[in-house]
């Protein structure tokens, strides 16, 4: 199993932490295991509570059903069903910016 380094950032919330995330673990689950509090609700990829934005790197969020193609093209992801596919940097708490 491959483990990636995922950097979670948000200047407004003073978040800048890098955590190890196994390829078969969602980024949200890994953050919870590290006692990092991130917003979430459904945990099934069908709402916008845990929306984040990929700054760098690649994730697999093929299980999500909420975001449209345009939003995904802009880098938006839902953390509850996002699995890292490379080392990456992710901006958290992005629900207010989802248009």
Curated annotation (Swiss-Prot):
Looking at the keywords, is Iron-sulfur present?
yes
Transmembrane segments in this chain: where?
A: none
Q: Where does [2Fe-2S] cluster bind?
A: 42, 47, 50, 80
PROSITE patterns xref list: 2FE2S_FER_1, 2FE2S_FER_2
Listed cofactors = [2Fe-2S] cluster
A Pfam family in this protein? Fer2
Keywords recorded for this protein, A-Z: 2Fe-2S, Electron transport, Iron, Iron-sulfur, Metal-binding, Nitrogen fixation, Transport
The 2Fe-2S ferredoxin-type domain sits at: 4-96
Record's cofactor remark: Binds 1 [2Fe-2S] cluster.
Quote the Gene3D superfamilies the UniProt record gives.
3.10.20.30
Tell me which family the UniProt entry assigns to this protein.
Belongs to the 2Fe2S plant-type ferredoxin family.
* The protein's role, per its UniProt record: Ferredoxins are iron-sulfur proteins that transfer electrons in a wide variety of metabolic reactions. Donates electrons to the nitrogenase 2.
Q: Write the protein's name.
A: Ferredoxin, vegetative
Q: Which source organism does the UniProt entry give?
A: Trichormus variabilis (strain ATCC 29413 / PCC 7937) (Anabaena variabilis)
Organism taxonomic ancestry = Bacteria, Bacillati, Cyanobacteriota, Cyanophyceae, Nostocales
